[in-house]
Amino acid sequence: ECFPKFSEEVIYSFKDASYEELATNLLFPYIEGFLSKNDFEHLVKQAYNSFSIPEIVRLNETKNLGLVLELFHGPTFAFKDVAMQLLAALLDKAAEKTDKKIVVLGATSGDTGSAAIEACKYFNDINIVILFPDQKISAVQQRQMTTSNASNVFPLSVKGNFDDSQNHVKKIFLEEENKNVRFVSINSINWTRIMAQSVYFFYTKLKIEKDFIASIPSGNFGHAYAGWTAKNMGLSFKGINVATNKNDVLHQLFLNNIYEQKEAISSLAPSMDISVASNFERLLFEIYEKDGKVLNNLFSSFPAKPIKFDDLPGDAWQNVKDFFQSSSCNDEDIINTIVENFDKEKLIRVIGANLFTGYLNTRSNIFDLKLTINDMAFSKPLHEELIYLTLGELVPHVVRVLIAPK
């Protein structure tokens, strides 16, 4: 119904809190009535126990890339672990409270499926079904999904792209014959994903104690909407750069005020190869004051016809554009940046291609660079073997370092 609100004074009272304590305090208003605060605090600690660093996420002040928020220290080396580990623990608690098993259903362009399966496979009261586009995700991510050996995990390859997989999932949820099945979405349709991701925007502000722009590699707009959520919960920060690869539907939206579906094109950052940003509808729901009928009318002819936002009433769309800006880059830009900076910056050896969409786009004079730019590193490069193949032709020693064991 509404976002919980935190004053600046309350937010800064969490300055010395651990990440788990911060998450507990910020997210408990969403959970209150389902769990006690003590039980929720215990659940959060257990959920993040599988991360490789005690702080869960890490801010890294780099010489050449600026301030980078490392979100890849979870069990599948992708930012989705931060939300998925918490979501799976909450689903298990729900199954326990109702004494009924839950079927988790989701579609993935790579990161989501791997993280969801890893998070859910340990819970006997959860079965998980993940649809992924055949030969359109990285080989590493496909192996992560198909080699769990868990009896409650069911990965399914689907002909087409991510949008086709997601459409199958949406149809299953709507089919009348499935109304008695306890399906739960693992995609960012699930609010837990959004609320969990909002936490590290607060974490960043509390660590640097100054205004910042969050540069977010973007496909489905979930992460960007989590930043909007943090803003509506009371966090003050300058704005968000929606950084896209050559699948630039979101960039064209903010640049030209037109939302138009295009065919997804395979890229070196496959987790971002998405042509319909589902979470953008959430933002519109807020703009239209939670009027679902208006939103349904707006999307009645989409994607057959693009949606134009020039005629939104009042300052609603302009307020959105004041907070969100965007840009895009192609595969060549990503490769050139990696090659240019590889020997200068060790962090490049452990981050995936998606970071460079954020890095490149915020360094293209879109923003006032006197502000701190917080690039978000979403995954490790082992998820993107196309990078290895391309870089191998350019800088062989780069590939040797990237794939070498620790």
Language model region names:
Residues 1-406:
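PLP-dependent amino-acid enzyme catalytic core
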